[in-house]
Amino acid sequence: MMKKNKPTVAQTLSPEEEQAKFFEEAKNNVMIQGHHMKLSLDNSKLMDALKYASNIINELRTSLLSPKSYYALYLVAFDYLQYLNTYLYEEKHGKKMIELYEVVQHAGNVLPRLYLLITVGSVYIKTKQAPAKDVLKDLIEMCRGVQHPTRGLFLRHYLSEVTKDKLPDIDSSVENGTVMDSIDFIIQNFTETNKLWVRMQHQAPTKDRERRENERLELRLLVGKNLSRLAQLDGVDQKTYSEVVLPKVVEQIINCKDKIAQQYLMEILIQVFPDEFHLATLDIILQTCAQLQSGVDVKTIIASLIDRLANFATRNADLVPDNIKIFDIFFNNVKEIIQARPNMELQDILGLHVSLLNLTLKCYPTNKDNANEVLGLCQSIIVNKAKEDINKPTCVKQIIQLLQIPLDVFKNVLVVLKLSNYQPLISCLSYNNRKKVSLDIVNNTINNSTIIEEPEAVNNLLETIQTLIKDEQDQPDMDDIDKEDFQEEQNKVASLIHLFDSEDPEKLFKIYIIARGHFGKGGPHRIRHTLVPLVFCSLRFIRNFKQQVDSGVISLDENKWIAIGSKIFTFVSETIKALADIKLADLSFRLYLQALQTFDHCGLVSRVKELAIKALLIFQEDIADFKAQVMALQLLISTLNSLSIPNEEIYESLAAQTIKQASRLLLPQDQAKLISTCSHLFWVDNPSRQYQNPDSVLQALKKALSIISNESSPGLGTFVDILNECLFYCDKETDAVPIQFVSDLVELIRTTHVKEADPALPYLQNTIKYIQSQNYKGISI
C-alpha cells in the first residue's frame, strides 16, 4: 500500500513581512559585497574593490522596497561608499583621479556608474586636481540619466551629501568656481530632486494613494536639504538671495503644482533663511502663497512667517528698515489671499487674524488702528459665514483669542474699548462664549484696578458686557444656569461700581445714572446683586459732596445744595424701591435706614422723614416674619437714636410711629421688650444731638410693663429686661424714671414672677448684684 504525501500549504506573507524579507535579503547582499570591497581595498586591489562597490549599488536598483525600506538600505550602502571615498582621498592606489573618473564611467549599469562617478568626482574636487565648478556641472548633468523617482531621488541626495563641503564659496578662487556656480548647482539639483519627489505619487495604484503620500512625506528631508545647503553658503547675502536664489526657488515651488511639495518647501524656505532676508522679500513670499494650490495650508505658512518676523522685530527693532511696513504688507496680502480662496476654512482665516493681531501689537504697540483693522476685517468675514462654522470649537477658540489678546497686551479696558470693532466681534459669538469674554473683560478691569472716570467709557463698558447685565434671547432658561456661578458673575459685575470714579461730582453722578440704567434692565435675579453697591456708592458720593461744600472746595448756596440733594435722594430712593418691588423687604428696609442716616448727616431733614416713612411702610406691608420684625424694629430704634434731626416735631412723630409698630408685634414679650427699648428714643445723649423727654421715657416703660403684666405666663426675662432699661436711666442720674418705680418693679418681680426653674433666674440674680453694687438710694433689695 502506497504512502500518501501530506499536501503542502504555501505560506502567504503580509505586506509588512514581505518588505522585511526583501530588505533583509538586499541588506545581506550589500554587507557581503561591502566586506569583499573592504578586503580588496586593504589588499590594494582597487579595480576589484570598484567591482564590489558596483555590486553594492546594484542592490539600490530594486523596485521591491517601500521608500522607507529603501532609505534604510541606502544608509547601509552609503557607509560602504564613504569607506571607498576615504581610501581614494588618501591616494594609496597610485592612480590619478582623472583616470579613475574615466574608469568608473565604464560601469555596466547606469545607477552603479553614477554613484561611483559621484564618489570619485567628490574626491577629484577635494584633491584639487580639477576645478570644482567643472566636475559639479558634469555630475549634475550625468544624474539626469536616472529618472526613476525613488532611485533618482536618492542618487541626487547622495550627490548633495558628498559634495556639501566642496562647494565653491566666497573664499574660493575664480578658477575653482564662484558662489554663483554653487548656487546654480544646488538649485538645479533641488529642481530635479523636487520633480522626482512629486512624481513618486504616481508610482502606486489609486487605492494606495494615501499610503504613498505618507511615504513621500517621510522622504521630504531629501528635498529640503538642498535649501539648507543654499542657506549655509556664506556667499549668499541678502541681495543674492532676493535677486537670484528666491526667484528660482519659488518658480519651482509654484510650477510643481503639488500641494504636499508646496506646503513643505514653503515651510522649509521660511525656516532655513534668516529673518532679515524674509523682511526684504516679504511681498514675493506672500505673493507666492497666493499662487499655491488650493489644498495647501497657507495659514500655517503665513502664520509661521508672521510669528518669526514679529519676534525678530521685537528683539531687533533697529534692524527693521523704516521703508518696510511689515503690518501693511502682511495685512494687504492676507486680505488678497482670503479673497482668492473662497473655500478657505474659517478656522484658518481666524488663525491668520490671530497672527496678524500678535504681529501689530508686538511691532507697533502704540498703533491701535492696526489692531482695530484686524478685528474689523475678521468681523466682516465672520458675518458672511454660516453659524455652524462660527460655532465650531476651533473657530470659537480663535475668536476668543482675538478678543483676549488686546486685554492681555494693553492691560487697560479703556484702551481696548476704544477699538470700535471689538464689541461687534463679541456679538458674533454664542451666549455662553459672549458671557466668557464679558467675564474676561470684567476680570481684567478688576485685576488691573482700572479706574473709569468718563460717563461715555462707563456706558461703553456696560454695553460691551451686556450679556452679564441683562437677559438675552439666546440665553438658557434661568433654571438651567448654575446658581453659584451666576451669583459669582453678578458679584464681579457689581464690584465694577467701585471702579467708577471721577473728581468731577457732576460726571460721577452721571456715571451712576448710566450704571443704574444698565443694571435696571437685569431683572430680579440680577439687580439684587448689582443695585446694592450702587446705593452705597451714591450715599458715599453725597457725603463726600457735602464735605467738599462744607470745606469750601465747592462753592454752593443753600438752595442749590438742597436741589442737588433732592436729585440724589430721588435716585437713591428709586433704586431702593426697585429692590423693594422684587420682594427684598429686609434688604430694602436696611438700605432705607442707611440712606436715612446719610441724608441726616448731610442736613437734609425733610428727606430723612420721607426715608423713615418708606422704611416703616416696608415694615408694615412686606416684613411678615415675627423674628425679622423684631430685628427690623431694633435696627430702626438704633438708627433713629443716632440721628441729629433738629426738628423735634418730625423726630417725635417718627418715634411715635415706631412705638405704634412695636405694639403690633405678634408676641406680647416682644411688644414689651421693644416698647421699653423705644424709651431711648426720648433720651438721646450723643455728640450730635441732645434730646430728653422724661415723661415719654416713663410712659414707654410703663406701657411695656403693662403689656407683659397682663400676660398669664409672662416669663421672668421680659421683666428683667424692663428693669435693666430702668437702671440705665438711674445710672444717668435723671428723674425720668422715679426710684420708687424701680423699687416697686423689683418687689413685683421677687414676689410674683420668680420661679426656681426659670432659665432667666441667673439674669435676675446678676441684675440684683449690680443694683447692690451701685447702692441706689430708695431701692431696697
Curated annotation (Swiss-Prot):
Extent of the signal sequence: none
Entry membrane topology: Peripheral membrane protein
Keyword Ribosomal protein found: no
Subunit structure comment from the entry: Component of a retromer subcomplex consisting of vps29, vps26 and vps35.
Family: Belongs to the VPS35 family.
Gene Ontology BP terms: intracellular protein transport; protein retention in Golgi apparatus; retrograde transport, endosome to Golgi
UniProt function note: Plays a role in vesicular protein sorting. Component of the membrane-associated retromer complex which is essential in endosome-to-Golgi retrograde transport. The vps29-vps26-vps35 subcomplex may be involved in cargo selection.
Compartment(s) where it occurs, according to its Swiss-Prot or TrEMBL record: Membrane; Endosome membrane
Disulphide linkage map: none
Keywords, alphabetical: Endosome, Membrane, Protein transport, Transport
Listed GO CC annotations: cytosol; endosome membrane; late endosome; pathogen-containing vacuole; retromer complex; retromer, cargo-selective complex
Protein name, as recorded: Vacuolar protein sorting-associated protein 35
